Amino acid sequence: MVTSAHRTPAGFAPPSSAGDRSAEVWSALGTVTDPEIDESVTSLEFITSVQIEPGNAVRIEFRLPTYWCAPNFAFLMASDMRDAIAELSWVEKVTVELLDHFSADLINRGVAARQDFRDAFPGETDDDLSAIRKKFLEKAFERRQELLVRYLLRSGYDASWISRASSRELARTQLTDEGIALRRLYVFIWRRIFAGLGEENLAFTTVAGAPLEASELPGYLRKVALVRRNAEFNGAICRGLLAARNSRLAA
């Protein structure tokens, strides 16, 4: 029997009341992204149900834009949802269920058993999800970096300052609400890419760690802008497909 449940149909905002466990779960889910387009599964409206069950258990159901979405991406998102919710101090059990997908059974069983993707699909794939995750993490880094750097340039910070600013200086810089949000997203992924580096290190480098020279910044931004535009294009397609699918299911 479910003692506390919150179901949110596609198109409705998740709960946000302070202290509500459902809101905590939604907040945790908001940190999980579609790896291909670097947008959260909540903003993309993939989540169809969040349930708080007896014994501090959480059950998540989600649906992707098509029945044929790539199973490796679906597996990544499902396992990331599981891990994000499991980090909540009161959660003792997490169940994540992918709905209406051709590989849903294999994905759901594999995520529940904490299997590697190749173990969940024995004999069917050689995909190394760690390599796939790294590839899309690097693309997300470039996308978030470009957005923050362009914001800083619009706000009066010149290319010279950007090329030499340390992470400490970036953290102390006074920004608008927009800038604070962009900085938070960038710093989060910077710490994942450059784990072990400190606040004295350069805030803005290439994904390989090479310094960005002020004179090279315009060309660099043009190059990484292609990553963002591709992600935004894929995101628009994704939303359209999901909206069409939800309309068919609701009919």
Language-model features: where?
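Domain-level signature for proteins that mediate thiol-based redox and metal-cofactor handling
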Residues: M1-Y67, N72-A251
